[in-house]
Design a protein with these regions (language model features):
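Generic, well-ordered alpha-helical segments
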Residues: 37, 48, 66-73, 87
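Conserved GNAT-fold acetyl-CoA-binding loop/helix
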Residues: 57-79
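A short helix-loop-beta-strand connector motif used in the catalytic cores of GNAT acetyltransferases and
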Residues: 65-66, 78-94
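Acyl-donor (CoA/ACP) binding surface of acyl/acetyltransferases
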Residues: 1-44, 48-55, 92-224
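Residues that form generic nucleotide/phosphate-binding pockets
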Residues: 48, 59, 77-80, 84, ...
Length: 224
């Protein structure tokens, strides 16, 4: 899992140009909503992060000694991510659960970011996410990932999406397995996580592998 907190070490790079993408973007499928971070979401974001601190700590990005600190507040985080999103370098979303499609009952479930977006001969991006422990295992993150992947392959015109996961993160490994991401092996000491450089397993998906869309494939798999 690539963490997407204020200290994320993933630096976005030059983005592709597309006529079909213009930030801000909100995506929805059933009760799952991907919405841009807003300043008014700060209270909910800080509360969920605080309540899940022990759950998230083993998978959280940390900064190597000597690194420049990232935004220190949620306000700064929103400004930084929004600027990079408008430039097409990343897609930062909060993941909301809306029971019965009722926005008044919306509950913050987690966060998902597509970062490191590049165009040209590379045309790819990386997905990172986290979820509230109390909502884990309910299909929220697989649905959110499928929504994001379809948007990247469609509106963004990307060719490849990667997800890097620590081998110990069994729950996150289940997400990519359910969605049919292709395993590509181990990258030793790939990201600075929980205070040290950690090995990660890399999983990828190319646009031609899901011509019908990842969300449709995921929905078909969930049907009894």
């Amino acid at each position: 899992m690539l963490p997407v907190g204020p200290d994320s070490p993933l630096l976005p790079r030059r983005a592709p140009r597309t006529r079909r993408h213009r930030w801000p973007v909100t995506l929805q499928h059933g009760e799952i909503v991907l919405a841009p971070l807003r300043q008014r979401d700060g209270g909910a974001w800080e509360r969920v992060r605080r309540e899940n601190s022990a759950w998230l700590r083993p998978w959280e990005a940390t900064l190597p000694p000597g690194s420049d600190p990232g935004p220190a507040t949620f306000t700064g985080l929103v400004r930084t991510l929004s600027h990079q999103a408008r430039e097409g370098r990343m897609l930062p979303w909060l993941v909301w659960l809306e029971p019965g499609g009722d926005r008044k009952r919306a509950r913050l479930a987690g966060q998902l970011t597509v970062s490191g977006i590049v165009g040209g001969s590379a045309s790819w991006g990386q997905i990172g996410y986290w979820v509230d422990q109390r909502l884990a295992g309910r299909g929220i993150i697989p649905t959110a990932v499928a929504l994001a992947v379809d948007y990247c392959f469609g509106a963004m015109g990307l060719n490849r999406i990667e997800i890097a996961i620590r081998p110990e993160n069994v729950r996150s490994l289940r997400v990519v397995a359910k969605l049919g991401f292709r395993p590509e092996g181990l990258r030793p000491r790939y990201l600075h996580i929980d205070g040290d450089w950690r090995d990660h397993l890399v999983f990828a998906l190319n646009a031609e592998e899901v011509p019908e869309g990842l969300l449709r494939r995921w929905d078909n798999l969930r049907r009894p």
